Amino acid sequence: VKTKSNLDLRINSVLIRRGRVTYDILSEPETPGKFNAHHLSVKNLAATLSLKALRSDSLNAAIRRVSFDEQCGFSLQKFAMKVTANNKRLDIKDFGVELSNTALKIDSLTLKYDSLPELPQMTENVRYDGSLKASVILKDLAPFVPALSRFEEPLDLNLVFSGHGKHLDCPTLQLANHHGLMIAG
C-alpha cells in the first residue's frame, strides 16, 4: 500500500567558505590542464544556498552564489538562480553564470508540463520559453575543449526561444563580435 509522502523540508541557508573537494579514480589516467571527471580537485569553493520549501509536490530554492576553481584551469566566478516548481510548471529566474571573461544570463525560463514524469523525456506536452543574453570568450571553456584556447575575442549572444518537446523556435537569434560581425536571424 502506497502512502502519500509528508515531505516538508526547509533549510534557511547553507554557507560554504574556502571549501576544498577532491575526487580521484586512481586507475584512470590524469590529463593535466584538461577537465577530467575521474580526477577532480576543487578549491576556493564558496556557496550560499537556500531551500525555502521542499514538499512532495513543490520546490522553492535559491542558489545565491556558487564559485570555485578546478585544477584543470576552469574557474567559476559565480553561478546563481532561483527555482520554483510544482507538478505542472518549473520556473527558473535570475539564472546567471560568470566565468573569468564570460557572463551568461537567463532572466526567466518557464517549462510547463502535464505531469512531472514527462519532464525528463521532453515529451510533446512539455512547453517552454525563455531568453538568454551572453558575452562569451570561448577560451574560458578550453579546459573542456582544448581547441578553444586560441579564441580570445568576445562573442555577444542574444536569444529568445520557445517550443514544445524537441521542437525549438528562436524568433530572435543574434551573434556579434567586437569587430563588427553580426549574425541575426
Task: Enumerate the language-model features and the residues they cover.
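A low-complexity, Ser/Thr/Gly/Pro-enriched, surface-exposed linker/loop concept
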Residues: 135-143
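Short, recurring structural edge motifs at helix starts
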Residues: 2-5, 145-146, 171
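Nuclease catalytic cores
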Residues: 183-185
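Extracellular loop and loop/strand-boundary signature of outer-membrane beta-barrel proteins
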Residues: 32-33, 143-147
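Elongated, acidic membrane-bridging lipid-handling scaffolds
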Residues: 1-130, 136, 152-155, 161, ...
